[in-house]
Amino acid sequence: MRRVTRNGVLAVAASGALAVTMPAYAAFASDGAGAEGSAAGSPGLISGNTVQLPVDVPVDVCGNTVNVVGLLNPAAGNGCADSGEPGASYQAAGASGGTSGSATEATSGGAAAEGSGKDSPGVLSGNGVQLPVHLPVNVSGNSVNVVGIGNPAVGNESTNDSGDHPEPVRPPAEPEPSAPEEERAGPGPSAHAAPPREEVSLAHTGTDRTLPTLAGGAALVLGGTVLYRRFRPGSGD
């Protein structure tokens, strides 16, 4: 019976020591886990791939009391916070007595991953896998007693704030090359008045009056022939 009681006391005492020391290191959170990578200009088979697995698991255990036989050991006024804004952690003493732990507040940047794949031709290339995980856990202001009197747990607060993550900076787009001088469109022709056309005419040779002259000459020859045949000598008139 004594051995069982002794083992139980040792187990509870160890649990109490763990509850006291856990706020010193378990509640501490760093600036978060982040990963950044890029795959560019890696042609080939299964090349230029990026796998990122940032994990951020802040755990807060503060303001807890574990007592076998406890009297007036409150756990009150403790605060645990996980903030996404970057900053340094600080430790503040809690308003508790006995074996109560201290309150620790830390800031965390959360889990973030950023990757890019550009100009990576090939089979199964330029791919990216990102699995950011953020699992904040808060355990604060608890009181465990086997036999306890006046051990309240009040006024405790736990906060998880992921904060606003800044937008990733995108590289500027490359400007398109300008067209060569030969391909550039030149200025259009100016609208000048067309010069007047000169009328082309043939030289006057008198051929337009030849036809009436020929007709008159033919009439005269015909008339002379008729008169000659009529009045020729030896005719039977």
Curated annotation (Swiss-Prot):
What's the protein called, per UniProt? Chaplin-B
The signal peptide, as residue positions, is 1-26
Localization terms from the record = Secreted, Cell wall
Family assignment from sequence similarity = Belongs to the chaplin family. Long chaplin subfamily.
User: What are the recorded Gene Ontology BP terms?
Assistant: cell adhesion
Q: Which InterPro entries match?
A: ChpA-H, LPXTG_anchor
Q: Which residues cross the membrane?
A: none
Topology with respect to the bilayer: Peptidoglycan-anchor
Induction annotation:
Transcribed during aerial hyphae formation on minimal medium, about 10- to 25-fold lower expression than the short chaplins. Weak expression in aerial hyphae (at protein level). Very low expression on rich medium, unaffected by ECF sigma factor BldN.
- Regions of biased composition (Low complexity) lie at 101-115
Q: Which residues form the Chaplin domain?
A: 42-82, 120-160
Q: What does this protein do?
A: One of 8 partially redundant surface-active proteins required for efficient formation of aerial mycelium; the short chaplins assemble into a hydrophobic, amyloidal fibrillar surface layer that envelopes and protects aerial hyphae and spores, presumably anchored to the long chaplins. Chaplins have an overlapping function with the surface-active SapB peptide; chaplins are essential on minimal medium while on rich medium both chaplins and SapB are required for efficient aerial hyphae formation.
Q: Name positions with the PTM Pentaglycyl murein peptidoglycan amidated threonine.
A: T205
Q: Where is the composition biased (Pro residues)?
A: 169-178
Q: Which UniProt keywords apply?
A: Amyloid, Cell adhesion, Cell wall, Peptidoglycan-anchor, Repeat, Secreted, Signal
Q: What stretch of residues is annotated with the motif LPXTG sorting signal?
A: 202-206
The terms describing its cellular component in GO are:
extracellular region
PROSITE patterns recorded = CHAPLIN (PS51884), GRAM_POS_ANCHORING (PS50847)
- Lineage, top-rank taxon, reads Bacteria
Asked if Plastid is a keyword of the record, the answer is no
Residue ranges, annotated region (Disordered): 81-127, 148-216
What residues make up the propeptide removed on maturation? 206-237
**Phenotype when the gene is knocked out:** A single chpB disruption has no phenotype; a quadruple chpA-chpC-chpD-chpH knockout has delayed aerial hyphae formation and sporulation. A quintuple chpA-chpB-chpC-chpD-chpH knockout has a longer delay in aerial hyphae formation and an almost complete lack of sporulation. The quintuple knockout still expresses ChpE, ChpF and ChpG. Quintuple knockout chpA-chpB-chpC-chpD-chpH has strongly delayed aerial hyphae formation, makes many fewer aerial hyphae but no effect on viability of the spores produced.
